[in-house]
Amino acid sequence: MKHLIQLFLSLTLIGLTVTLNAQSRYLIKFKHKGQNAFTLANPSAFLSQRSLDRRIRYGIALDSTDLPVTARYVDSLRAIPTVVVLNVSKWLNQVSILITNTTPANITSVQNKIAGFPFVQSSSAIAQRIAGSSLPAGKQLEVADGTASQRATDLQADFFNYGSSLNQIKIHNGEFLHNIGLRGQTMVIGMLDGGFQNYLTVKAFDSARLNGQILGTHDFVANEANVNNDHPHGEQCFSVIAGNLPGQYIGSAPKASFYLFRTEEAATEYPIEEHNWVCGAERVDSAGGDVISSSLGYYEFQAPLQALSHPFSDMNGNTTMAAIGADLAAKKGMLVVNAAGNQGDPSDSWGRIVTPADGDSVLAVGAVSTSGVPGNFTSRGPSSDGQVKPDVASVGVATVIANQNNGISSGNGTSYACPNMAGLATCLWQGFQEFNNMKIITTLRQVGSRATTPNDTIGYGIPDLKKALINLTKEYSTASGSIATCKTTITWNSKDVSAMKYELERKAPGETGFTKIGEQAGKGNAFANRTYALSDSLINIQAGTISYRIRQIFDTTTATFAADYIDTITVNLTASCVTTAANPQNEVVLVPNPTPRDAFAIKITTTNAIQNLQIRIADMGGKTVHQSTHSKGPGTVLIPISIAGLAKGKYFVSIYGKGQLISTQELLKL
C-alpha cells in the first residue's frame, strides 16, 4: 500500500533494511476448476454454517467462485522442486507461489514446467523475494503520534463513557446506536491490514480478549497464524473499532467479534498484496464474517514491476484484482468498507482514490476532522467510470487511537476514518439484518451531510446514524387496521426499546387534520422487533374513510429529540356510529348516573327481542375497559354492570344489537 497516508506526526516508522533478490514470486492462474472434489450440492464441506446462513438470509445463490481451487492443480505446483505454494484464491482461481532458487536457469525450468500443465491459463511475476520487514523508499503507513489526545466532554448520560474518542463517535450520532443496545454484538468484522503489533498486550483490547471476541488470526504474508509482531498500523485501526477503556477510549463497535488478517506486506509494494487481499476477504467470507474493514489501497508498484502499476483508467471497480475481489465479497453478502486513500494533497501527482475503494459495491471512506472539515490528504473521486467516490466520510483527521504502546494518541488518514465508519455501520446493520449489505450502503449515503449534493472530496458526506436508524425503521415497520362494532383496532410492527414511544393519530371523515388519540410505550432494553395494538372508539364518527398514522418517538430527550411517522393506514367505516336520543321505539337509561358506587345498571327498552346484545365501555382515550354480551326479550330489561376496577372519571357506554349501534351514553363515576 503506497502512500496510504502521507501525514504522520512524530512516531518514527519501524525499519530494517530490505534485501530484494530476483523476481521469485509468481501468480499462476488456472483455466477452470475441473475434477474438483467439492460440489455446490454440499457447501458445508467448504463454507461455515454462518457463511451459508448469510447466503440463505439474503437469497444469494452459490456459484463456481465458491468452490475451492482444484486440489490436484495446486498439488502439481507444490510437487515442483523449489516451488512453495503461498496463498490460494478460489474466487479468482489462482495461486501465488515462491520459487526458492532464483537462478535464471531454475526460474526458466520452473516456468517451463508450469506452462506445460494443461490446466494453467497464465503465469506472471507478481513480486520479488524479500528479507526483512521495513518499508521501501517512499512507502508509508500512517502511524499515530505519541501525544495523548485531550478528552472531550460528554454532556449526555450515554451508555459508554467515551473519554477522548467521544467526538469521533458523536459526529455520526453513533452514541445513539450504542445507547439503544447496538454495540456490535452478534456481528463479525474481518480486518485486513499490515499487522496488529502488540494487540495481545494492549489494554484497550483486554475485554475483547477476555470475552473471546477475537475469533482468529492469520498472516497471509508470512503464512502463519501470528499477527502480533508485525506493523502497528492494523492494531491502531483495530482500536478505532474494538477499543474499550471506559472513561478513556471507546471504539465504534466494541462488542463485535473479529478476525485479524495480515494481507499487506509493509516492506514492499507489489501486486501480490492485491492477491493477498482477495485471499483474506475469502477467508472472512468462509468463516461467516459480516463486514470487512480494510485500510489498504493500491495503485503504484515498485521496480522492477512498476509496469504493473495501475493507470487511473483501472480505477473503474472492475479491473484490479483487489476491486474484483471486493465486489465478489459484496456479492457474497458482506459489507465491504475501505479507506479512500490519502493522495488528495495538491502536491501528490496521483490525487485520486485507490483500489479497492473504486469498487462499485464498496463503501469508500474519506477523511474529515471532528468539525467536519475534510483532510487535505483525503483522496478525491470520482472513479474513472464516474462513480461518486468516496461514498462517505468519517473522522480521519486527528483521529484518536489506542496505540501499540498502550497509550492514547492521534493520527491522520483515511485508514482511521475507515474503521470508525465500519464499526458504526456494523452497529446499524446489527439492528436491521433483514436488509442486505447494499441497503446499508444506500442508507448511509442517503443520510450523509451532502446526500443531495455529493462532491469528489467527501462524497455523500458525513452519515447521521440516528437518521439512518429512523429511515430503516420506517421502511421495516408495518401497520394494519380493522373495524368491528364502531371500534377500530390498529396493529403495528416496528423496532424499539423502552426509552422510545409511539403516538397514534386519527383523521375522521370531515376533519382536516390529525388528532392524537393514544400512546404506546416501547419495551425492552435492546433494540428489537415488537408488535403492538391499540383500539379506537368510533362513537359519534360519521361513515366514511378514517386515516390513522403512527408516530414513533425515537429520542425523547429534549436536546436531541427525534421522531417520525412510520406508517399511515386507512379504514372504511360503512355505517355511521353517530347516535341520537330521538328514537321512540328504543330507550337506554343509565342508573344511577353519575354513580358513586362500583356498579350501575343499564335500563334498555326495545320493541323487539335482541339475542346478541353487546355492551362496551370505553374510557376517554377510546380504550375498551369493559365488554359483555347479553340477550333480552321485547320490552324493558335492567342489566347490572360492575365497574369496580375502573378509576373515577368519564366513560362512554355503547349498546349494540345485531352489530348495529343502538345508543351511546356518557357515564360519570364519582
Each language-model region and where it sits:
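C-terminal outer-membrane/trafficking sorting elements
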Residues: T19-N21, M500-S547, R551-F561, N583-V591, ...
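Subtilisin-like serine protease catalytic core
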Residues: Q23, L40, S165, E175-E273, ...
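Inhibitory N-terminal propeptides of secreted protease zymogens
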Residues: Q23-V143
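Protease zymogen maturation seam
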Residues: Q111-M187, L200-A204, P304-L305
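Substrate-binding/access-modulating region of protease and related hydrolase catalytic domains
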Residues: H178, Q185, N244-G247, L260-S361, ...
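Catalytic-core environment of secreted peptidases
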Residues: S207-G212, T217, A303, A367-Y416, ...
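Hydrolase catalytic cores
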Residues: F238, F261-E265, D290, S394-I458
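Residue-level detector of functionally pivotal "anchor" positions at catalytic/ligand-binding pockets or at interdomain
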Residues: L469-A484, F561-V591, T607
